Amino acid sequence: MSFDFYNELSRGCQAMGIELDRPGQERLYTYFVELKKWSQKVNLIAKGTGEAEIVENHFLDSLALLPLLPEGAGLLDIGTGAGLPGLICKAARPDLRLFLVEPRAKRVSFLRHIVRTLQLEGVEIYCSRIEDEPELFASEDISYITSRAVSDISGFLAMTEGFKSPHIRRLCLKGPRWQEELAEADEVLAAGNYQREKVVEYLLPFSGAERAIVVLR
């Protein structure tokens, strides 16, 4: 029996309370097809990842950010890899302004291919490390910063300490250890005068895996 991407995505979004219009679903399907194709030659996701796993662990987990992002929000995704979570969110919601930072050239080629293929506007891609892009620190277009599977909370805060605006929110995508990570980051949080605004806990709809988005300001 062939895999039904649309059914899997729709069921997952419904379970998580995420609304997607039909054009958004179609863009994500194209993304899904291209991700599978490119992953045969470029290290984008773990080898052997099944189609249902791609939808749940990568697409749905990334889309969990959407309810936290107001219309037209400027999102910076550091170490985005295959575009997770930033470009997935942009494919679903083209109104977002997106900044992607990824140091590996082959992955950047994939990101640019997706942006061209989906005809997305308002995306800036940097083949670099965040510490080598000081102009981003002063950007008034960035209101949210995120990163997925790159570092713990302490490392993420250290990585983004150049962003001084009190209006910027940091969205930390975490697993079941989020409370431990937050406790370990106590000194860094205090030194930077960061406040925990809220924590959104959720379960991935098919595996039941525990996830959380820690929002820091």
Curated annotation (Swiss-Prot):
The keyword Membrane does not apply. Disulfide bonds: none annotated. S-adenosyl-L-methionine binds at G79, L84, I130, E131, R148. GO terms for cellular component: cytosol. Its EC number is 2.1.1.170. Keywords: Cytoplasm, Methyltransferase, rRNA processing, S-adenosyl-L-methionine, Transferase. It is an enzyme of class 2 (transferase). Coiled coil: none annotated. It catalyses: guanosine(527) in 16S rRNA + S-adenosyl-L-methionine = N(7)-methylguanosine(527) in 16S rRNA + S-adenosyl-L-homocysteine. GO terms for molecular function: rRNA (guanine-N7-)-methyltransferase activity. It is found in: Cytoplasm. Specifically methylates the N7 position of guanine in position 527 of 16S rRNA. Belongs to the methyltransferase superfamily. RNA methyltransferase RsmG family. NCBIfam families: rsmG_gidB (TIGR00138). This is Ribosomal RNA small subunit methyltransferase G. It comes from Desulfotalea psychrophila (strain LSv54 / DSM 12343).
